Regions:
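ABC ATPase NBD Q-loop/coupling interface
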Residues: 18-34, 97
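Q-loop/switch helix immediately C-terminal to the Walker
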Residues: 45, 51-65, 77
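ABC ATPase C-loop
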Residues: 113-114
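Conserved catalytic motifs of ABC-family nucleotide-binding domains
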Residues: 117
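Walker B catalytic motif
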Residues: 125-126, 133
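Helical segment within the ABC ATPase nucleotide-binding domain
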Residues: 135-148
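H-loop/switch region of ABC-family ATPase nucleotide-binding domains
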Residues: 156-158
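Conserved small/polar residues in nucleotide/adenosyl-binding loops
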Residues: 169-170
Length: 171
């Protein structure tokens, strides 16, 4: 719920206080404006989007953030990130999350995190339902995000498994 409220999900209403991000009051901003400002939410149950490829989704989101992206550079970085997550290249051409296992959906979310490099990443139970190997790979992707980018992470979890693998300031 916290992640959805921070991202401005329409089904939740803030009844008091403010949501400040980078010194700006975003309490009444739309979800897309929050995303453009640098916020990212990894869903506990990622949606399936038939007809929109994983690659197309990430490239479109990246272009919304930074403008034109050279296709060669994009493909090279996408391949690098997918390799870190041990995702077969064919996943890039598949419809977003359609037919993906739970672990594959989580990897796709972390792939988005690695490619979009948001200022604030809210990971909502990213490790939920994952086996030890999948948690290790997801954690590796989160570590890569931290290494490559000076962004903040808000990790919402019922387990400490992912926390054991990432660098953190406050727990």
């Amino acid at each position: 719920t916290l992640g959805y409220v921070l991202m401005g999900a329409p089904k939740y209403t803030v009844t008091g206080g403010q949501i400040l991000f980078k010194g700006e009051d975003i309490t009444h901003e739309s979800t897309d404006k929050r995303a453009k400002a640098g916020m990212f939410l990894s869903f506990q149950e990622p949606l399936e989007v038939p007809g929109l490829t994983l690659e197309g989704f990430i490239r479109s989101a990246l272009q919304q953030k930074v403008g034109h992206v050279r296709y060669y550079d994009f493909k090279k970085e996408l391949a690098r990130c997918m390799d870190i997550l041990q995702m077969d290249a064919s996943y890039a051409e598949r419809s977003l999350n359609v037919g993906f296992s739970g672990g594959e959906k989580k990897k796709a979310e972390i792939l988005q995190l690695m490619m979009l490099k948001p200022s604030l990443a809210i990971l909502d139970e990213t490790d939920s339902g994952l086996d030890v190997d999948a948690v290790r790979l997801v954690s590796k992707g989160v570590e890569e995000y931290q290494k490559d980018h000076n962004g903040a992470l808000l990790i919402i979890t019922h387990s400490t498994r992912i926390l054991d693998a990432v660098s953190y300031t406050h727990l």
